[in-house]
Amino acid sequence: MRRPKKYESGEATQYISRRAALRKLQLSLNDFRRLCILKGVYPREPKHRRRAQKGSSEIKILYHTKDIRFLLHEPIVWTLRDYKIFAKKSGRDRAIKDFRNLKRRLALFPEIKLDHIVKERYPTFIDALKDLDDCLTLLFLFSTFPSLHLIPREQSNLCRRLTIEFLHYVIASKSLRKVFISIKGYYFQAEIKGQKINWIVPHYYPFKPQSRQEVDFKVMSIFVEFYTIMLGFTNFRLYHGLNLAYPPQFPSGVLQDNDETLKDESSFVSERIAALNFELLRTDKLQEDEEEPDIDMELLEQDGDSKRIIKMKQDAQEITRLRTLFKGLKFFINREVPREPLVIIIRSFGGKVSWDSTVFSGSTYDEGDESITHQIVDRPSLATQYISRDYIQPQWIFDCVNQRQLLPTNQYFIGEKLPPHLSPFVDAKRDTYIPPEERALHDPSLIETHAQSDDESEEETAAQEEEEDAVEQELLDAQLQRAYQEETAEYKKYGGADGVNEDEEDSDDEQLYEDEDESDDDEEEELDEKAQRLLEEKQKMSVQSGKVHKVNKRQVHKAEVDEHRLQARMVKPRHRNLFRKLIREKQSKEKEEWLLRKKRRNIDTDAKEQKKTAKRDARKAAAAAAAAAAQLGAK
């Protein structure tokens, strides 16, 4: 039996360097990178790098050997090799100016087919939905790009078309759940087939080309190439699940025969689809306003009343109400407000929306429509206003969706200072800093106690002073009444202003002394009985006086430190780095929470000081105005 040599088995055979993989696949570095992106193969970090690299201490990019062996049987490898042959032959035809042969070769340009890769990477439809977050975020980003050197116009147009189709599905299925405005863009969360999908829609700013190539658009374009195929498959499956025609089409009532439609029907339809303001054509004739919930309520009713089942029932009822949150409301979007995010949100929850026809095609009613209930404005003032509608800022739409109810509009009027815009994508049970407004949302009892105004504090102090004065007055009245009773008793005891005879006085005194002796004897007997009763009760129940226990904070802190040191000593040597990392993360979180609390405290104190100074100035101004008026009246 041959003795195995070193690095012929074990970890050394499980990994392969990138250079060896390129030699094995006979591909260039760019083609290898493209193949790895399309197939989902990525570099690996070995447990023992020196063993994996066969004794070499140089840091190399390593892949699993089985992944490279898996790439050997990929049909795309032959297409990538055909690209080299095509480039050589087309270059030769250009050099000799054989344009006839060049035209023939361009017609036979080798195309990469990615259908089998999508099916291979996502065996089930749920797997594709789980990996849809990055896909949507990247495609929404590329849909805003103009034609660049490494991003062709056709790719940007395809990204725009696929994302609009997905938004139409979200509107038709009413699957939107959470929304949020951030510096990066608009965050959305939809629940499709039980999977929560999050994506970001960037803000609509003019594109600014970068002088330095900090972003590798070529690599991103390869990701987009795969994600477009994936989202196309997903949209097809989603549309057929709702009985919608794919590609999206309009009913015949929308396409009216006029000059605009007869000139170019395809561009008219594409513009109306991009408007997101029309219902799509269904393959069945039944128009279902609301999709039935995925949870079987009858099955839940058969189970016991456990907390989990009750919570599922409550969530199902909340989602049913949420789908019709804006039902019966008509919105009008002003020119300065971003149109597309608000149209998605309003239509996803049953509302109707329109805008100025000069901004974008697809508006359904004008600003002068009297049935409009809300107009969304993002400017300090308006020249003309209608009494029949509320003029609100765009944040009202987002906050209503996140709190799943229609909020009062008085805090969102034109020119009003908006309340804090809280993110719905945070965990309420987390250990980090939670703003007071968010705590008040989860616990309504905190609303009254949080951030009391100066008026309330002044009223409370005045009420406390009144109560103290009333208590003092009651004590004084009680003392006066007691003194008056004692004086009247003495007055009756020793006679009054009308004098009496001495004999009568002596007889009265004797009688009085006798009565007092009898009463004293009775009182002594009663006291003896009470004392015996108290002794019996004490024998039954013994109570000792409590002692105040003062906590020594220094000793408590020392005990915690000793416990932490003991815990650190008990950690195994191989887990010490992980333990230190966890401790550092905990300390950084505590420090961040402390800084945020301090910052919020400073903000609250500054706001209170500003309110006090404003009230003081207002009082001074009122007093000065009153004095001036009095002087004028005297003259």
Swiss-Prot record:
Residues 437-472, 489-561, 600-619 are annotated as: Disordered. Residues 547-556 have a biased composition (Basic residues). Belongs to the pescadillo family. The lineage of its organism: Eukaryota, Metazoa, Ecdysozoa, Arthropoda, Hexapoda. One of its GO terms (molecular function) is ribonucleoprotein complex binding. GO terms for biological process: maturation of 5.8S rRNA from tricistronic rRNA transcript (SSU-rRNA, 5.8S rRNA, LSU-rRNA); maturation of LSU-rRNA from tricistronic rRNA transcript (SSU-rRNA, 5.8S rRNA, LSU-rRNA). Required for maturation of ribosomal RNAs and formation of the large ribosomal subunit. Residues 529-540 have a biased composition (Basic and acidic residues). Keywords: Coiled coil, Nucleus, Phosphoprotein, Ribosome biogenesis, rRNA processing. It comes from Drosophila grimshawi (Hawaiian fruit fly). GO terms for cellular component: nucleolus; nucleoplasm; PeBoW complex; preribosome, large subunit precursor. It is found in: Nucleus, Nucleolus; Nucleus, Nucleoplasm. This is Pescadillo homolog. Residues 596-628 form a coiled coil. Its main location: nucleus.
